[in-house]
């Protein structure tokens, strides 16, 4: 589908990793962005220790190369998450 081209490659790598490893990195990323990139709020929302979130975020950066300091990249990833969810609902 044409919308798929708006999903950044960085995000596609993360989806693949999560599928292969039954991970929660995508969920962690969604909650982290929803909580304005606050590790503490993300940990509270997910009922895990903040160090768990820190570890997952490092893993996310390692796998995908996402730069959370780049506002344009964060916006592209946020939009990609929404588009991916929409495409899954259509299937």
Where are these regions (language model features)?
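Cytosolic nucleotide-utilizing catalytic cores of signal-transduction proteins
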Residues: 1-91
């Amino acid at each position: 589908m044409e919308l798929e081209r708006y999903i950044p490659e960085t995000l596609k790598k993360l989806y693949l990793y999560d599928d292969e490893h039954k991970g929660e990195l995508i969920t962690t990323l969604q909650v982290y962005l929803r909580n304005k990139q606050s590790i503490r709020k993300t940990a509270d929302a997910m009922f895990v220790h903040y160090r768990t979130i820190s570890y997952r975020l490092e893993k996310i950066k390692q796998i995908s190369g996402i730069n959370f300091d780049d506002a344009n990249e964060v916006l592209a990833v946020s939009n990609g998450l929404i588009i991916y969810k929409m495409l899954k609902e259509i299937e």
